Amino acid sequence: MKLLPLKVGVYIASFLIVFSCEEIPVTDVSGKANTERESPCLSEAANCTDTLKIDRGSINYYSSFDLDSSHDIRGVIVTVHGAARNGDDYFERMISVVQELGLQEEIAVIAPSFITLYEKQNELDWYWNTTSWKWGNQSYMSDLGESISSFGVIDEVLLRLSNQNQFPNLSQVLITGHSSGAAFVQTYSSTKENNQYKNLMVRFAVANSQYFLYPDSSRYSNQGVYVPTNCNNYNNWPLGFTDSNPYIDVLGVENAKMFFLSNKVEYFVGQNDTETSDMS
């Protein structure tokens, strides 16, 4: 299992935000100035776990700040785990990156945990199979006959972060992932209209993705652009927009293509990331 290299993580975090040195007081829901802040959770991930209720189900996540409380954080990094579904490791690695930069009081770290049946502990837990979560596919049906796209989980996180009563100083959110998590982030970037959240700049960082989504049927090689022949299903989701999932169908394929091309997405490829047997 590989994690995001520390140097890459530092770079990803450092381009997120340039902070002002001025202390800006938080204004709570009652309108009163409040300069107090909750101390960030910086210990091991097990101590920084919370539950996000979405529709009539829930998903666990790790966070350095409580999403249901008011904070004066300026930025958020949402880090998505790889195939090993080890959100705790990714949370701890990104926390170490933020601490390395001395920004633990200014940047919150959030790491969702997309689980399978094997990790399911509660009847309300949303869960997927080992690959469907990273494609934005629907979870398995709950006992109530409902399901949710894994993309919908990040939607809920962004919706909460866009609440200016709770996060009055928050201006930027970076969504990043490594390997399978990078594949998730790259495909998810096609679902968000630029400036969809008026008070938030949402950016994406894709590090060592397993594969890449293309906006059309063209592909690239050392010889240039070409359209593959005798290669069935090469343009199917998540490699292309053919036979996409219900989330994309509701959004609209043409909208997704437009969003894909308009969003701010940074790509990172590790020179030494050449192992082909490790699918994390």
Predicted feature descriptions by range:
Residues C21-V76, A84-E100, Q104-A108, W135-S142, ...:
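A domain-start/cap signature at the N-terminus of enzymes
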Residues Q104-E119:
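Conserved alpha/beta-hydrolase
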Residues G152-L170:
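Conserved acidic catalytic loop of the alpha/beta-hydrolase fold
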Residues P238-S280:
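Serine-hydrolase catalytic core
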Residues I77-G82, A111, Y267-F268:
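Structural cue for short, hydrophobic secondary-structure segments
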Residues I115-I148:
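Cap/lid segment of the alpha/beta-hydrolase catalytic domain
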Residues M1-V10:
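Bacterial N-terminal signal peptides that target proteins for export
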Residues G9-V18:
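Bacterial N-terminal signal peptides
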